[in-house]
Amino acid sequence: MYYRILMLHLFLFVNSLLAETSLLSICNIANNTSDIVVAGGSITEILYFLNEEDRILGIDVTSNFPKQTSELPSIGYVRSLSAEGILSLNPKLILGENDMGPPLVIDQIKEVGVDLRVISEEQTAMGIIEKISCIASIIGIQDKAQEKIKDKLMPKLRDLKTFQDSKIFKKKKVMLILSMQGTSPIVAGSGTSGNGFIKM
């Protein structure tokens, strides 16, 4: 019960934050939300979570979940994108992680005038809710997102908290391998989404 109340207060706080701070300029509704290019795996996953995947034109290579993403055009790696590759898909809206780059490409996209939103990230339960709320606000489905968060996400976060508080939970040393480059593993470093996932 305590955790449910905590999450409710958290959700209300996030929504008030979106309305009253500088996040508004990033999270306010876009003029055209039908043709989206995504640079960042978590954003792609959120759009699928919200059942809004039909809006997606293309994705970056970190967007590998769910498996249906393999059918979408790729724009390359989130940190080493090209403006030409992105703009060739004729997007009306680009949603990117805060490590989207390089900076020159972001500047080139802004010069063309395509609506680009770089969404900040915090690797916590609050950060997940805040990110979903922001993306939902951009594409104009806040009410739908609230229901999804309440019905689908909250129970999972509650179960996670229950497990962390249980006696069987023990911290272990782990490493998250994102992919293999030849024989060398690409691992999640400090400050990445992967590292945040491990900590949670």
Model-predicted regions and their roles:
Residues 37, 56-57, 73, 169-177, ...:
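Mobile, glycine- and charge-enriched loop segments
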Residues 62-65, 149, 185-200:
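Alpha-helical, coiled-coil/dimerization segments enriched in small aliphatic residues
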Residues 34-105, 117:
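A short, structured surface patch at a secondary-structure boundary
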Residues 1-2:
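N-terminal secretory signal peptides that target proteins for export/translocation
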Residues 19-21:
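Boundary at the C-terminal end of the N-terminal hydrophobic targeting segment
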Residues 85, 108, 197:
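Hydrophobic/aromatic ligand-binding patch that stacks against planar heteroaromatic rings
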Residues 5-16:
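Bacterial N-terminal signal peptides
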